[in-house]
């Protein structure tokens, strides 16, 4: 570059690489001919870059540049990251290290986090939040401090008149927050002085100031170029100004719009430059969400006019068409200027090579993006970059690419909490926090890394036995209920007790953590448990190494600060901390595919760039106000508004749009429902106008849908299985007859196929569990009355609940209502003239060669000698109408068994049939419990027809199904109130809508 080659000069040397040129490649293309000629050439050059990722991107650009020209070796420039806390050492001889000795070290971020939590607790006193909430507040406080420190705002600035004048107009909570923040900051500064340390942001500022003074006094003998640095922090802006004025220095900016009209440039707002001394540097109307705003802010703080910035004329290998930059400029016009779209000429809105793809779901979007990547790789040498801030979408794309053995690493990484090693430690913390709750416990023991020193298959075999036993309502906390479950199943599984000893040895320390103990000690217990389960595999991969660094640092820091936690908060605290740690993949992915986050995508370029996840709340992310300082306070202090980051996201998209080929994609729905298109995507669509159809990508969507769409198939018929006579030869229970007649398929699935529904782990206690428990209590109470007629039912209820390992919360909610209902039953039984003959009585009979059996909850002897059959219900009993319709035949079948002498302990004719409900009742003295009979009611069967009708229905079931050949058709009677247990098995949703009325009848 001729301009860059000049020595000296009266003005700053600032350049801009247009979006369509590709920053890193264009930068290298311009630097190489200027600096490689004499001596060590490029090795004499120092590049100041914004991030470690940018350093890697530029290094790759150098390698591509020389590789394309067949040159084997090169000495690359020294590259220093401006945010490096050891910038003085990175610059080496260019910056006298001795001169930086007076700059204190930076405080460790984790130590600052825990120390701020302690200060907040002391400042807030009784109002201080507890546990994880306090630590979250400390993290937010640290972020706000960093935001102010980057702007060189010190605690004393919070007490200046420009801020104090605003306090009276603020809401009460903002006032309290400001006072607390100011006090904590002041105490924190005092603490740092005692430690002879500074915040990381302060150290960076001091290093920038030191370098600025050193180079302003004596410029380095070798060239220094700041490339891609766009941070507008005042100290860094001053350093960049100094670099631009050095004889061999220059500043190169990405994507500064030099063609923008001055009127539009002015419409962006003040951007840090107050029109008068007392005015705020940021106005309410500033277009902080514009992609050029942060660059205007930087130029203003550097003291460089936009007219002084020169265009960089070199271009990279993956440069886009020049007219693309004009379209990008028009695309992001501020609100007033966007009226010009109506009169824009074609060359100003030309977006050739840009396509828009709108999928239905994130899954379809990921599949379509993977197909676009796969297609692009068919062309030799073509590079593809997928840019998205949605890490879940990125993981889906990575998984889909594995279909073709394309290994694409997500360079943005994953949070440590979402990796295998991190998740294992978190699950151990959840077990400690929840007292070995079944969901957390089974998840921990089933973790892919867990084996407990055994063969993994043997480990899982025993675990499945325990997991099946834990299905149902949550037991009470602790290991004792689990040990009782293991003991109860030891006879059927001899290896289970030995396996449980291993597990118990791991879990016992987790559940023995003190109520309020040291965080360091708790982490040590968690690590020991995780190692006992996973062994060395816990630390073997990159996530394990990251976890090792994390736990060691947190443990040491927590011990130094004396941080204490409750076990119940342990998992929340660790998850919050691990979410801040990114685990990036090692090298080894496909050389021509990259998946970036927004930060990682800066300065990178590819032949095809796919911008995915373009929905509001994703790209751009939702703008959130500072939780501690009110927006007017931040404006008065000279801090950009909350939407500033939206402008950075817009700049990232503008940079990506400069690629030769660009695909912008979104999903119409996400996991929560309909999604709103990104404001950036809506601008692209509006700019294209009538040309939008020409820029729509549909091929990839068609391919993606073709991969998931199955070939058309015939409508699934209504199931009507016809088992053999041998398979049909099953008994009929009293509760199954109505299912056999109303929905034969359910009977077939349950009695012939022997399929039973599995309860979920920690399932909410439902009617089935409540019924079993209530029946067990009543059975024991009746049995106790045989020896003690005055036996109380409450102690029996307590004992049954203890044996059932019922969770304390469940007991607290249900026991009072249950006890009231049970007391009603006890009172009714004591006051009755009946004699209780049998409880939970099993009976059976042979009916036309088929065994019919049932269990009567209670059988009473009536004063006249007949029998009363009682059925307990925890909820509302079947109505007389349902009984008459044949939808509730249990009492009738039990009556037939009793009539034929099927109950050995209760001979006699059945005369009464009753439901005793434990549900709420206004007529009960206790508020719960009532009895009713379906027989003899106006809408129910008469006493004379009840048993004969039941017998006829039983004979029909035996004749047609058990002894006959009638198919077990699904939903034979559509009015039958069937359970949904087997709906999926019968594929109900596939055939029910098309079932014709004749078939129904």
Give residue ranges: language-model regions.
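RecB-family 4Fe-4S metal-dependent nuclease core
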Residues: 524, 538, 672, 713-1001
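Polyanion-engaging groove/track-forming segments
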Residues: 1-788, 798, 803-804, 811, ...
